[in-house]
């Protein structure tokens, strides 16, 4: 390492943050549970937060899967609650019923089942 710390700083810039903040994710999960209430749906955490490669400014990606598309009012309420919360990261919400099969398969394969149907 050089005396200026340059090499260390550059390594930190390239390296993803690997430890997900459990308190932050817990707040997101709690808000999702609250808004979904008894809606029968599976909720997946996917993307960089699920892989553990997120950075401090990375958005949090969640996907909701139910037998039928979720009511637009419910999705709007969830998005609004997340935007108005004190959660510092943007949270992207995807209704899997509105996506193509390849995307759904990727979320199911690579994502983490965060909330199981009926436990919201």
Stretches with model-predicted labels:
Residues 61-63:
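Short, well-ordered beta-strand segments
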Residues 1-44, 51-56, 65-120:
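Catalytic core of pol beta-like nucleotidyltransferases
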């Amino acid at each position: 390492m050089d005396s200026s710390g340059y090499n260390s700083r550059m390594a930190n810039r390239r390296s993803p943050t690997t430890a997900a903040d459990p308190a932050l994710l817990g707040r997101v999960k709690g808000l999702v549970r609250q808004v979904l209430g008894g809606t029968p749906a599976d909720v997946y955490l996917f993307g960089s937060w699920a892989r553990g490669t997120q950075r401090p400014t990375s958005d949090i990606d969640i996907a909701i899967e139910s037998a039928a598309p979720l009511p637009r009012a419910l999705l709007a309420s969830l998005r609004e609650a997340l935007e108005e919360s004190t959660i510092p990261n943007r949270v992207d919400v995807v209704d899997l019923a509105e996506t193509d099969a390849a995307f759904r398969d990727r979320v199911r394969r690579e994502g983490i089942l965060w909330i199981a149907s009926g436990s919201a």
